[in-house]
Swiss-Prot record:
Residues annotated as binding GTP: 504-511, 554-558, 608-611
Location of the region described as G5 in the Swiss-Prot/TrEMBL record: 644-646
Xref: InterPro entries: EF-G-like_DII, IF2_II, IF2_N, P-loop_NTPase, Small_GTP-bd, T_Tr_GTP-bd_dom, TF_IF2_bacterial-like, TIF_IF2
Entries under Pfam families matching the protein: EF-G_D2 (PF22042), GTP_EFTU (PF00009), IF-2 (PF11987), IF2_N (PF04760)
Biased composition annotated in UniProt, kind: Basic residues: 392-401
Biased composition (Low complexity): 189-198, 222-240
UniProt keyword annotation of Nucleotide-binding present: yes
Ranges of biased composition (kind: Pro residues): 75-86
Name by which UniProt lists this protein: Translation initiation factor IF-2
Organism lineage: Bacteria, Bacillati, Cyanobacteriota, Cyanophyceae, Gomontiellales
Feature: compositional bias, Basic and acidic residues: 258-274
Region (G1): 504-511
Length: 1005
């Protein structure tokens, strides 16, 4: 107990009061306490001490030790067998009761205080009914304590053995009328029920008489006996039972009628008792019966709980709810309290309407039924109802799932387009994942639910399940998916310049041809002489005495830049296919043809390098016919123009053909609307931030427009054309560099101008979330291992990994490098790109590389200040490249370096056994070296008639009785082996040694 806390029982001991008296004072002062062991603050204790000085029944604190029995007053019922000795004790206070009859007459009806003194002892008898009396009378009590104190002091000496201190406190004036009725008949039965309190008087013989009327109502006796046994358990909570009626007191205080009636009835009864005390004992027995009946409901209520059938039912319920026993136990204890309150109400009504004993017995008969109904059963039933639906709901949910699984129809065919996990494959096949894993296990592949399966393995599993596997045709990325013109644009259409894309194989002269057209020297400034970006250029061409503009897009020809070529074909109006006359059709030429055909754009073939002596234009035309490109002179519809970019031959003819084709195509756009188009290229500039090259395909783009390109949102701050000049507006078919975006968009994304920034931001956030999910999926797939014989190594952690951080100049370069890296065999060494983005190499990239043991690759980009020093300090390797060939070669070499070198057998020479000599315990083979040489401690094989006889190590090699390190061809030598002695003439000896050899990446491994 802390210094500022006081316990109730310590306070009662200091005040020489009973615990119940202190609890009553606490209730009067509205101090919340639960029991005598509760703690209160010092301030509350001081309030209780002050109130205790005015508390009248406190003199009965001498009965404190008995009050503990009164707290066990419930156990007092076991004393019904011993009521007679206690009855004489209760007989003594009969004289006091006679005084009481006098006192009520003197103070009139309002002398509730005087009546309280006798009540203090007599109300103890109807303890069973105490709660009911306590509920209305306690409000009266605080007013009376002062006046009653003298009378109590007088009564205390008379009742030193009296035990019923709490009864005194709880007894109201209302109980006084019952008291006078009790003493003349010698209300020993009530003290017998409550255990003798401060009323000893009234002869013992009358007590059996009182019980005889109870015998008349067998229910009373039957119920009283069990009550005696049942009451001890609730005895402890009884102290707590008093508070609830007290809470109801304020409600009962409001109606004074019951109190006045009870007081008047008490007075009347008192008068009758005074007159009838000697004359009619029958009336006394009637009053006693009334008192007994009042207490009986409590006994009956408690006895109703005890029937065997109910106990058995409770036991069954407890067994069903074994897990919730602690909760139910507490509830069971509380419910009897509530029932007692209900019984008190019934008793109170019985006291107010004192009628025939038959009415009282009927009221006694009624409570047991509702009490039995209120017994622990409802609680248990309620809990079972609550718990039952839970378990039932779970069962139903499982059934529903099973039904859904059963009702889900299995498809007869499945479309597989790429790698996928076991879970995804199971969902597509409408099968449980366990079936997929089991099938793979039978095939010798141990897989988990998140294991990535390559297309071949997934197809094999699907076929094992009896399904047809369909592989969809890969849609060309060059196909035009969005129509830039809308219905409302049709009224304001105007002609626009054609967008021409130059495509072809690497080193066939695409950029040189464009330079010749533009009269610039772009090709000379390119690293390695190859184009690695898309360039957008504007050229003014004179045609029919008019200057017309043509927009040229130059695409890379290297195989790694497939996506760039496809992107160029998707946005173009006319494709110029450049083919070298001396080289013919090459792989990237074929790819460019497929892109142009997928985009459904007309193709103009420019046969370049006709100035070379080895040029064969006709052979080129013949090769192109295999791809449905038939020249016009051969009866086809494909325009083919032989040109020489170096000598500027036939360039005017080529431009004229381009303009003619553009006229046939009817190229129109609406410049009076907000701009729409495609991102050609994008990169992160160190000084200017994100920079995107945009091709406006419809509408007009102006400075200040709110632009959304993919998930990148921003406001156009500046636009720069291909010659480095700032422009304020970009009309259809115009390519410009745009500054002001918040992020680097992906090349190939479509852009659009919005009037409402909030709408644009919402769309940008949605697209960013989708990109984040796709990146997560790519990260998962980057860790995949093909389910081959090496999958075991992957699971055991033996699979080598090469971590890369890639930084390039533009988004298109990043895309091209990633695609090229994906073509490298990764069966034995897994290639993981941790981060790939356009921009310069920063210290953050170096820190990430140091944490993940990665190599930083920079392509056509620079190093930020401090990044090189940080890399040197942390030991991070930064590789810079400007040609994609070298980048890919070095990465392949690094991956091969991670492979464990393999041991390879290297042949040394051959020898033949010519003779066998016994030496000591063994034999020596005299041999002749036929080819190569024999080296001591090398590996040898002994072959006899082509069959292997022995394989081991050459332990001893001698030449003319001297040890030799090696013997070359054409010489004789002696060979001795420690573990082989079965030499025979004619045996062939093959000498070899095991050497380590660097492994190479094997795509079929």
């Amino acid at each position: 107990m802390s210094n500022n806390k006081v316990r109730i029982y310590d306070l009662s001991r200091d005040l020489n009061l009973d615990n119940r008296d202190v609890l009553i004072i606490c209730e009067q002062l509205n101090i919340p306490v639960k029991s005598h062991s509760s703690t209160i603050s010092e301030s509350e204790a001081d309030r209780i001490r002050a109130a205790a000085e005015k508390y009248v029944p406190s003199p009965s604190t001498h009965s404190m030790p008995p009050t503990r029995p009164t707290s066990h007053s419930r156990p007092l019922p076991p004393q019904p067998g011993k009521p007679q000795p206690k009855v004489p004790q209760t007989k003594v206070p009969q004289i006091l009761e006679l005084r009481r009859h006098q006192t009520p007459a003197e103070p009139a009806t309002g002398s509730a205080g005087s009546s309280v003194a006798p009540v203090s002892r007599s109300p103890v008898e109807p303890q069973a009914g105490l709660p009911k009396t306590a509920s209305p009378q306690r409000p009266v009590r605080p007013a009376a304590p002062g006046s009653n104190s003298p009378s109590h002091s007088e009564s205390t000496p008379v009742t030193p053995p009296a035990i019923s201190k709490p009864a005194v406190s709880s007894s109201p004036a209302r109980t006084e009328p019952l008291r006078p009725a009790v003493p003349p008949p010698k209300a020993a039965p009530s003290p017998a029920a409550m255990a003798g309190r401060a009323e000893p008087s009234q002869p013992g013989p009358q007590k059996p008489v009182l019980k005889r009327p109870k015998v008349e109502s067998p229910q009373a006796e039957v119920e009283s006996a069990p009550v005696a046994t049942a009451t001890p358990a609730p005895a402890s909570p009884r102290a707590e039972l008093t508070p609830p009626p007290r809470r109801e007191l304020p409600q009962l205080k409001a109606p004074p009628r019951p109190r006045s009636e009870t007081s008047e009835d008490g007075a009347r009864r008192g008068e009758k008792l005074v007159a009838r005390a000697p004359e009619p004992p029958g009336t006394e027995t009637d009053a006693i019966e009334v008192l007994q009946n009042v207490s009986l409901p409590k006994l009956a209520g408690r006895g109703a709980k005890r029937p065997k059938t109910k106990a058995e039912e409770e036991d069954e319920l407890q067994e069903e709810l074994a897990a919730k026993t602690p909760k139910t136990a507490t509830k069971l204890k509380r419910r009897p309290q509530l029932k007692l309150e209900d019984e008190d109400d019934v008793d109170f009504a019985a006291e107010v309407n004192v009628q025939a004993v038959v009415d009282v017995s009927q009221s006694l008969v009624r409570p047991p039924k509702p009490k039995a109904a209120k017994s622990a059963k409802p609680a248990a039933v309620a809990t079972t109802r609550i718990s039952a639906p839970k378990t039932g709901g779970r069962k139903l949910s499982r059934r529903d799932r099973r039904q859904q699984e059963e009702t889900q129809e299995r498809p007869t065919s499945v479309v597989l387009s790429g790698d996928l996990t076991v879970q995804e494959l199971a969902n597509r096949l409408a099968l449980p994942t366990s079936e997929i894993i089991k099938t793979l296990f039978f095939k010798g592949i141990a897989a988990t639910i998140n294991q990535m399966l390559d297309l071949e393995t997934a197809s094999m599993v699907a076929r094992e399940m009896g399904m047809e596997v369909e592989t969809p045709e890969v849609e060309s990325t060059a196909r035009k998916v969005t129509e830039m013109l809308e219905a409302q644009d049709l009224e304001n259409l105007q002609r626009r310049p054609p967008v021409v894309t130059i495509m072809g194989h690497v080193d066939h002269g695409k950029t040189t041809l464009l330079d010749a057209i533009r009269q610039t020297k772009v090709a000379q400034g390119e690293a390695g002489g190859i184009t690695q970006h898309i360039g957008a250029y504007h050229v003014d061409v004179e045609h029919e005495d008019q200057v017309q503009q043509v927009v040229f897009l130059d695409t890379p020809g290297h195989e790694a830049f497939t996506a760039m070529r496809a992107r160029g074909a998707r946005v173009t109006d006319i494709a110029i296919l450049v083919v070298a006359a001396d080289d013919g059709v090459r792989p990237q030429t074929v790819e460019a043809i497929s892109h142009a055909q997928a985009a459904e754009v007309p193709i103009v073939v420019a046969i370049n390098k006709i100035d070379k002596p080895t040029a064969q234009p006709d052979r080129v035309k013949q090769e192109l016919t295999e791809y449905n490109l038939v020249p016009e002179e051969w009866g086809g519809d494909t325009i083919m123009v032989p040109v020489s970019a170096i000598n500027r031959e036939n360039l005017d003819t080529l431009l004229e053909m381009i303009l003619l084709v553009s006229e046939v195509e009817d190229l129109y756009a609406n410049p009076d609307r907000s701009a729409r188009g495609t991102v050609i290229e994008a990169h992160l500039d160190k000084a200017r931030g994100p920079v995107a090259t945009l091709l406006v395909q419809n509408g007009t783009l102006r400075v200040g427009d709110i632009l959304l390109a993919g998930s990148a949102l921003g406001k156009v701050r500046a636009m720069i054309d291909d010659r480095g000049q700032r422009v304020e507006a970009a009309t259809p078919s115009f390519a410009v560099e745009v500054l002001g975006l918040g992020d680097v968009p992906a090349a190939g994304d479509e852009f659009e101008v919005f009037n409402d920034e909030r709408e644009a931001r919402a769309i940008a956030n949605e697209r960013a979330n989708q990109q984040r999910l796709s990146r997560l999926q790519q990260a998962l797939s980057s860790r995949r291992v093909s389910l081959t014989s090496l999958s075991d190594q992957a699971r055991e952690g033996e699979l080598k990994e090469l971590n890369l951080i890639l930084k390039a100049d533009v988004q298109g370069s990043v895309e091209a490098i990633l695609n090229a890296l994906g073509q490298i065999p990764q069966n034995e060494v897994q290639l993981r790109v941790l981060y790939a983005a356009p921009g310069e190499v920063t210290e953050t990239d170096v820190d990430l590389a140091a944490a993940s043991n990665a190599v930083v690759i920079g392509f056509n980009t620079t190093l930020a200040s401090g990044s090189r020093a940080s890399a040197d300090q942390t030991g991070v390797d930064i590789r810079e490249y400007n040609i994609i060939y070298k980048l890919l070669d070095d990465i392949e070499g690094a991956m091969e370096g991670l492979l464990e070198p393999e041991l390879v057998e290297e042949p040394l020479g051959q020898a033949q056994v010519r003779a066998v000599f016994p030496v000591g315990k063994g034999f020596v083979a005299g041999c002749y070296v036929q080819s190569g040489k024999l080296i001591r401690n090398c590996k040898i094989r002994v072959l006899r008639s082509g069959n292997l006889v022995h394989s081991g190590t050459l332990n001893s090699l001698k030449r003319i009785k001297e040890d030799a390190r090696e013997v070359n061809a054409g010489y004789e030598c002696g060979i001795r082996l420690d573990d082989f002695q079965g030499w025979a003439e004619g045996d062939q000896i093959e000498a070899y040694q095991m050497v380590t050899k660097r492994r190479t990446l094997n795509p079929n491994a």
